[in-house]
Amino acid sequence: ESSAASDVYKRQAWKAARAGLRKSRHTSRTYYQRESKGERNMKFLDAEFVQGFIRMANDGWEQGWHERNGGNLSYRVKPQEAESVKEEFYPGEWRPIGTTVPALGGEYFLVTGSGKYFRNVIIKPEDSICMIELDESGENYRIVWGLVNGGKPTSELPSHLMNHEVKMLATGGAYRVIYHAHTANVIALTFVLPLTDEVFTRELWEMATECPVVFPSGIGVVPWMVPGGRDIAVATSELMKEYDVAIWAHHGMFAAGEDFDLTFGLMHTVEKSAEILVKMLSMRPDKLQTISPQDFRDLARDFKVTLPEKFMYEK
């Protein structure tokens, strides 16, 4: 599919969404279906939270963060959102999560599928994503919608759910999105910077004035670990008690937030800061001038954010 054809399709799709229409693709067929206003049970793909999920997945693909089946996204669904699409559910068998998240018992999540490509989410969502329900113990899940051609949720499901549990408890339920992407500039930096929270936070804060305002608590760093298992999930969830961003060395980045816009914006900001640092290091190994610890304190005062002093060390 050519870039021009792809652009035309996306423009048509979003125009249709704004007009209250739905555009769906099934094999070679494309059709529009108008939904009657005030219909009690919306079709699943028309739900606003599903549209937001699809858009965020496509935004990440367009940034170049999701080669092949790389990366994953999950959203903790609000009770009223789950209720609005319940008529579309077809519950499957219960399966073990691979960890236990008791605080999330009974919750619903929208997640990307294992082995699925982000580039296909916008054109084949029913095959690329799924909604899952957790049992009351938080030990098992079942698919209630999606992955129509078979499959299972992302292989990083234990990491996602353990981090959802941590952020839900830490924020009184405000945080609902967990996002993992293969951000190239952040990954590159994990080969040349010490793998410490202090160094990564300070270096990325210095690259753009907005950074301490967007991620004032800093960034956590997980050393290289085998992905997809409980060990990396535990290590990441420990960092998420303190941070909204965790870098996985030589792998990518994990971000958490209240909604799709804030979480994508957080990932985008950190990766852009990393891009600036990579460019700077390609020009010379040191800086002639930068933002000082006192500058950060002044910024924190005026923008009313709290910046941990552990990142204000003298170089």
What are these regions (language model features)?
Residues 1-12:
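Single conserved hydrophobic/aromatic residue that forms the stacking wall/gate
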Residues 13-19, 35:
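Acidic, Ala/Val/Gly-enriched low-complexity intrinsically disordered segments
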Residues 18-21, 25, 123:
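Polybasic, lysine-enriched low-complexity intrinsically disordered terminal tails
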Residues 42-315:
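Glycine-rich flexible loops
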